[in-house]
């Protein structure tokens, strides 16, 4: 049961990090004026 909980936490963390990374990487394409971050 503990292993299942750890696996669930890992999957949720991966999804959250992927969502945040995708949002940050697609942000400069939506705002062309903020190219200084690249």
From Swiss-Prot:
Pfam families membership: PsbI
Single biological process term from Gene Ontology: photosynthesis
Keyword Plastid (UniProt): no
Localization per Swiss-Prot or TrEMBL: Cellular thylakoid membrane
GO cellular component, one term: photosystem II reaction center
Phenotype reported upon loss of the gene: Loss of about 25% of PSII activity, cells are slightly more photosensitive. Altered assembly of PSII, with destabilized binding of CP43 (psbC).
Family: Belongs to the PsbI family.
Parts of the chain that traverse the membrane: 3-25
Quaternary structure and partners: PSII is composed of 1 copy each of membrane proteins PsbA, PsbB, PsbC, PsbD, PsbE, PsbF, PsbH, PsbI, PsbJ, PsbK, PsbL, PsbM, PsbT, PsbX, PsbY, PsbZ, Psb30/Ycf12, peripheral proteins PsbO, CyanoQ (PsbQ), PsbU, PsbV and a large number of cofactors. It forms dimeric complexes.
Record function comment: One of the components of the core complex of photosystem II (PSII). Not essential for assembly, it probably binds to D1 early in the assembly of PSII and stabilizes binding of CP43 (psbC) to the reaction center. PSII is a light-driven water:plastoquinone oxidoreductase that uses light energy to abstract electrons from H(2)O, generating O(2) and a proton gradient subsequently used for ATP formation. It consists of a core antenna complex that captures photons, and an electron transfer chain that converts photonic excitation into a charge separation.
Membrane topology term: Single-pass membrane protein
InterPro entries xrefs: PSII_PsbI, PSII_PsbI_sf
Keyword Membrane carried by entry: yes
Residue numbers bearing the N-formylmethionine modification: 1
Protein name: Photosystem II reaction center protein I
Alphabetical keyword list: Formylation, Membrane, Photosynthesis, Photosystem II, Reaction center, Thylakoid, Transmembrane, Transmembrane helix
